[in-house]
């Protein structure tokens, strides 16, 4: 990619940037897209960057109106950037805790936050991340070693849209068609006719090997790629096809008398431990190696990671700190000094996450949260609230920090105004906090009975809950078989994490994805099978029609994800209102 060769002049005079229509379009798209990530996060533990969807829809609507209406102003490059900044900030709000620490806190303590306090908390940790990004911006964007791959992908799409308008219109049609198809399938399955979950035998059905009619899972499979897809398949076979029958045979897991159908809830109580251990150890090992490499490159380049605060932005930064600390004390009963201690840790870990994202494009939010949990497990042992909410502070701020750093990368290339981007990001997290919390409460009105089930596996919740439970109660609270499983899973994760980080890329690609391997232990086998199917289908199409796949695969997959998830949230709201 060579964006500077584009016919769009980079760093041109900025016109109509933070316009009412750019902001309002981003807000509307954020309202529509935020529930998609909440839904997907609770289903499979992953989310999707909504920047490209927002770019395509915003351009399609406003440029289409401009071409049909005499005198209507064209939709500018900078308005597109503000639109995607608002929408992606809203959709990325799940990093504020909605699909991991907040539900894990409810499962461990039995306490559920009301809507308004939950909105305030999610907004506060995200707001802190925005200000961390503001002060990291000059040093990180000036570091030539940090490419910010995700930001560059958004930039490439943005420039491509304005250079090839017809292509953008075609991609928008593909996006909407895929969304309509998956939404229709979900609506039929929910309201008209329950699509059968076929399985070859009753035994395989009991082990969760069924055909799940979810096009969202197929769409995610198309995005994750063949390596991750096949690893999910391998993990499902190992966990649910190998370990699960052995656990039942040895009596380590007992099923209710006369039980039939998938027995996910009973089996995952054991299987989640080796899976979580594998994921945590591999991500922490990989993060440690990346940090060492980044430390050496930063030291060699003599670059600073932080800039001296200026009075204006410093007031916003101070406000964000006051919000986070006071809400920890008021909502969770955390000691004020402990609450204050979460701030420097969150700043350090968000800075680490920003550099990792700049170098690799992969946000290590899970590893950041678990590292914070381990830190406070030492400082404040046996305290669930501080363990989870310190990690929530670190993970939430890191999530928004990395999202805004990618936007700053795009903004610098096209000559956008950083202050206006910051305002757009703040509006986005405000809208996302409200919509995300409402979507979460609509989907999961009773976390204690609904989460960690076949319908809502919530693997991120299982991970955070397991780490907090282990650090709070100690390993002695677990059975001997689970302790051995944790040890073996951790050892495998450590080995794979080290190999993945140290081997050359052309060799590391043949290793299984450690995140996917561990995740397959926490997801029903049916979910892993459908995601693997999506990955294999996309790979086969790319082998036959590589150009077609490059142009439309991600767009079609994003449509499948958005269509089912939006319909799923709407169906939950409808059923909730009907029951009310």
What are these regions (language model features)?
Residues 1-580:
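Alpha-helical multipass membrane-protein architecture
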């Amino acid at each position: 990619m060579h964006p500077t060769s584009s016919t769009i002049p980079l760093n041109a005079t900025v016109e109509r940037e933070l316009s009412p229509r750019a902001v309002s379009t981003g807000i509307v798209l954020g309202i529509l897209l935020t529930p998609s990530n909440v839904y997907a996060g609770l289903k499979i533990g992953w989310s999707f960057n909504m920047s490209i969807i927002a770019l395509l829809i915003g351009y399609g609507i406003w440029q289409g109106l401009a071409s049909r209406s005499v005198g209507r102003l064209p939709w500018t490059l900078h308005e597109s950037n503000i639109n995607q900044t608002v929408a992606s900030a809203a959709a990325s709000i799940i990093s504020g805790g909605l699909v991991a620490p907040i539900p894990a806190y409810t499962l461990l303590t039995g306490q559920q936050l009301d809507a308004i306090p939950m909105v305030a908390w999610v907004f506060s940790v995200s707001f802190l991340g925005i200000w961390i990004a503001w002060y990291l911006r000059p040093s990180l964007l000036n570091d030539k070693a940090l490419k910010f791959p995700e930001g560059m992908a958004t930039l490439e799409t943005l420039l491509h849209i304005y250079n090839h308008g017809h292509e953008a219109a075609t991609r928008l049609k593909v996006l909407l068609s895929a969304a309509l198809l998956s939404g229709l399938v979900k609506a039929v399955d929910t309201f008209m006719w329950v699509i059968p979950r076929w399985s070859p035998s009753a035994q395989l059905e009991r082990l969760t090997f069924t055909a799940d009619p979810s096009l969202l899972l197929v769409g995610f499979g198309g995005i994750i790629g063949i390596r991750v897809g096949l690893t999910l398949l391998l993990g499902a076979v190992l966990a649910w096809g190998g370990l699960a029958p052995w656990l039942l045979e040895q009596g380590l897991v007992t099923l209710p008398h006369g039980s039939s159908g998938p027995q996910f809830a009973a089996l995952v109580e054991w299987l989640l431990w080796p899976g979580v251990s594998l994921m945590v150890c591999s991500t922490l090992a990989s993060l440690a190696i990346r940090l060492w490499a980044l430390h050496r490159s930063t030291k060699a380049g003599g670059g600073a990671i932080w800039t001296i605060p200026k009075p204006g932005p410093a007031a916003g930064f101070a406000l964000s700190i006051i919000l986070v600390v006071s809400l920890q004390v008021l909502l969770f009963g955390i000691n004020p000094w402990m609450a204050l201690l979460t701030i420097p840790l969150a700043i350090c870990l968000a800075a680490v996450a920003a550099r990792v994202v700049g170098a690799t494009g992969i946000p290590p939010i899970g590893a950041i949260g678990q590292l914070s949990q381990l830190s406070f497990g030492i400082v404040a042992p046996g305290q669930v609230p501080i363990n989870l909410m310190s990690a929530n502070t670190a993970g939430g701020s890191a999530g928004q920090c990395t999202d805004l750093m990618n936007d700053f990368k795009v903004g610098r290339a096209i000559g956008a105004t950083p202050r206006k981007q910051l305002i757009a990001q703040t509006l986005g997290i405000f809208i996302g906090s409200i919509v995300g919390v409402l979507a979460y409460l609509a989907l999961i009105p009773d976390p204690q009975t609904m989460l960690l089930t076949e319908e809502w596996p919530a693997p991120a919740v299982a991970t955070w809950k397991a780490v907090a439970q282990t650090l709070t109660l100690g390993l002695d609270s677990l059975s001997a078989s689970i302790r051995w499983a944790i040890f073996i899973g951790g050892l495998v994760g450590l080995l794979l994490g080290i190999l993945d980080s140290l081997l050359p890329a052309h060799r590391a690609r043949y290793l299984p994805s450690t995140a996917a391997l561990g995740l397959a232990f926490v997801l029903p086998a049916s979910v892993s099978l459908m995601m693997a199917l999506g990955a294999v289908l996309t790979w086969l199409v790319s082998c036959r029609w590589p150009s077609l796949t490059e142009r439309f695969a991600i767009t079609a997959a994003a449509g499948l994800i958005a269509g089912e998830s939006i319909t799923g949230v709407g169906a939950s709201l409808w059923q909730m209102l009907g029951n009310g």
